Amino acid sequence: MAASRGPPLLGFRALALALLLAILLLLGCSAAAAYAGAEGVLRQVVGRRGDDGGGGNFFEPFNVTYDHRAVLIGGKRRMLVSAGLHYPRATPEMWPSLIAKCKEGGADVIETYVFWNGHEPAKGQYYFEERFDLVKFAKLVAAEGLFLFLRIGPYACAEWNFGGFPVWLRDIPGIEFRTDNEPFKAEMQTFVTKIVTLMKEEKLYSWQGGPIILQQIENEYGNIQGNYGQAGKRYMQWAAQMAIGLDTGIPWVMCRQTDAPEEIIDTCNAFYCDGFKPNSYNKPTIWTEDWDGWYADWGGALPHRPAEDSAFAVARFYQRGGSLQNYYMYFGGTNFARTAGGPLQITSYDYDAPIDEYGILRQPKWGHLKDLHTAIKLCEPALIAVDGSPQYIKLGSMQEAHVYSTGEVHTNGSMAGNAQICSAFLANIDEHKYASVWIFGKSYSLPPWSVSILPDCENVAFNTARIGAQTSVFTVESGSPSRSSRHKPSILSLTSGGPYLSSTWWTSKETIGTWGGNNFAVQGILEHLNVTKDISDYLWYTTRVNISDADVAFWSSKGVLPSLTIDKIRDVARVFVNGKLAGSQVGHWVSLKQPIQLVEGLNELTLLSEIVGLQNYGAFLEKDGAGFRGQVTLTGLSDGDVDLTNSLWTYQVGLKGEFSMIYAPEKQGCAGWSRMQKDSVQPFTWYKTMFSTPKGTDPVAIDLGSMGKGQAWVNGHLIGRYWSLVAPESGCSSSCYYPGAYNERKCQSNCGMPTQNWYHIPREWLKESDNLLVLFEETGGDPSLISLEAHYAKTVCSRISENYYPPLSAWSHLSSGRASVNAATPELRLQCDDGHVISEITFASYGTPSGGCLNFSKGNCHASSTLDLVTEACVGNTKCAISVSNDVFGDPCRGVLKDLAVEAKCSPPSTTKEPRGEM
């Protein structure tokens, strides 16, 4: 389990002081001023208050304001990097490690939404425990020395169920969401006030010594405001004034709100925001959502945004005047239970983020962006010193430079020996061609679609297109199962499901249609959510249809079958006739036409409506609903069609096993379990088995690719929905050319495979052994092929040229605040995950190696000593750094530019696997 990392109190205080001195030096302070400022408002006070809420402050109280250039922390402009991390998409035990990895990656701020439906599941009943313990999360952020950006909303979107709105909200008489509607405004104000009051009570605002420096009201309302006319405008203005009236003492923002009032900072959400400017000169340029990836839908390919393009977008933002940028997401996490949004969004919210769904660093994205953040921080004294616009120099038809300095810079001459603070960004926005540009008395080569950062207006510290970070290959990869579930087995194999799972499975059949005393009958088709109140994905509709002998004879003579049609369904509809599944339809408000086999006499017709995440985006969410719309008709009878819409329908909410809680360890006696036999696959079946936990502390993943669709519980915890829906064969390419504007369909992967096979099981939900796994399976599958794995980087690799930049650690700030670099050779760095060591070097070559990670090969030029030298430096260590130089390896081929390529294997301390238990 993750634990909060911290040195002893005295050492930590010294570290805090050192960090403060570095910050003040970045701001251009003298050494004397830095020491004087050490007792000022920016000092972090450590050890006085932990996450148990004890007395004292995390920081010396400080004010947060802003000017046209930046957010001001304690009166000082800051260039801030923010990391999006939604607390309910991880477990509390994961939070300390995740926050620490955000900080290590260069983040100053943690950003999160506040999820209304998680905190107020029933009207007036509040919940702030477990994954929804917002106060604990905020205190952990502060304990790590980071700031918090709290996006209260309370509309979140976030690909979260119903956009974060509680479903009970739609039942309030006369309510209309997100417009000038009194019932809605009253509930919104009550909840926002609740959150603000709680934050004040816990002393979490900056002026109280807490971490919160920014807040958001509403969310992307400008995208839909036009749908509401003048009522939308009035609502937006009301929301702003309501927020300001809460007297939080820190700035409020509204994203994608070009008409935001003067007192509110309007901000940008997009893949690129370098061209964005707020609606007033008095406001700083803030990027609230930098989409560094994208979400996935069931049956879709997996989005991927290359690290080079993500870095390019961020560098351009700061180059052109940006001051605070937030990665959406830096850690995406998991839509546990039924929190995934709709329509049809998957359980994983990995988002191709720098930290993956399980909390492991995604390399090279995390490392490349960390290097970018370091380079930007080296430029911070220059960036904050410019009050107006930087110097702009046109370097070519598609090349440009922005120069930030404390005085006028003559860009035609060398900056060597110049004492003033100066940093420059050189951009090549050509998508295809390299460019050689002349500035500062020398030539610089710019790859296509890239930015070079020169913290001293002379030396390049970083280029967005040249990756120096390692690449990691995981034991569990998204979209890499050995089985495709397009063709389900018709016979169960009853073979071993892996080294941790029991080979014994038990089954229990789910009742089709009505099963309990809480069912009711009414004429007509009722709207799904009006009946279920979203306490279950499932709603049964059952009626009876009388079929005459004339109908049967008619079908026999024509060689046809009657069909059931429904005008519109969402998300999944299943049709049962006399207890047997006849067919299904999947889609968002699509029509259904299902041929069915009816017999003479009374036939029981049962429809099952299934929700796969409530709509999370758009106008008029309260009207979107679920279930069926329009007419339900039986066609193809001898006397014509029969309209069943207004028939007497019996309604049953949920599954019998679900409401009997047969997934809970203490409720195993509530179902009639029988040992699974080698038999035909049956839909609507519950399965259970026992399993042991993989040794160590690595995250745990379960492969459900052999199953169809359903839900999975571990020790009573609903890990989420699963569905082995296959993505189309087309839409992915074998290689990804990142230059050029990115969108979510560019560089997709996983075509022709199930969108999600692997599912996260948090370790804190597990015991060492005798863990209970329960599945509800709707369509049929083979549970004996389910497997369990520990998730970690099994292979790390890197390739660095001898002409790469010096390591960023060679840079520092002089007392004047000017950036300076010491002469240093490039370095190749490798690092395994926490608790793992480099166990073997599987490839190493200094010379002219070819290929990439997992595909390296030696070239004609190769230093024979490479493998031995790299092995000596790295094996047995968690991380290592090797100078890329002839001084280390000798010169195997004079006059030839050489690279060092290394591939290494990472291993946990112990790879011994627990024997699986039997039930």
From Swiss-Prot:
Recorded GO molecular functions are: beta-galactosidase activity; carbohydrate binding
What cellular component terms from Gene Ontology apply here? apoplast; plant-type cell wall; vacuole
The cross-references to CDD domains, in alphabetical order and at most eight, read:
Gal_Rha_Lectin_BGal (cd22842)
Tell me its EC number(s), please. Answer: 3.2.1.23
Reaction it catalyzes? Hydrolysis of terminal non-reducing beta-D-galactose residues in beta-D-galactosides
Active site residues according to the UniProt entry: E220 (proton donor), E289 (nucleophile)
Residues with attached carbohydrate = N63, N412, N530, N546, N855
Top-level division of the source organism's lineage: Eukaryota
Output the Gene3D superfamilies linked to this UniProt entry.
2.60.120.740, Galactose-binding domain-like, Glycosidases
Subcellular location as annotated: Secreted, Extracellular space, Apoplast
**Secreted as UniProt keyword:** yes
**Signal peptide positions on this chain:** 1-31
Q: Does the keyword Secreted apply?
A: yes
Which PROSITE patterns does UniProt cross-reference here?
Answer: GLYCOSYL_HYDROL_F35, SUEL_LECTIN
- Name a single GO biological process: galactose catabolic process
List residues of the SUEL-type lectin domain. Answer: 822-907
What keywords is this UniProt entry annotated with?
Answer: Apoplast, Glycoprotein, Glycosidase, Hydrolase, Secreted, Signal
PANTHER family cross-referenced by the UniProt entry: BETA-GALACTOSIDASE RELATED
Membership in a protein family = Belongs to the glycosyl hydrolase 35 family.
- What protein does this entry describe? Beta-galactosidase 15
Taxonomy of the source species: Eukaryota, Viridiplantae, Streptophyta, Embryophyta, Tracheophyta
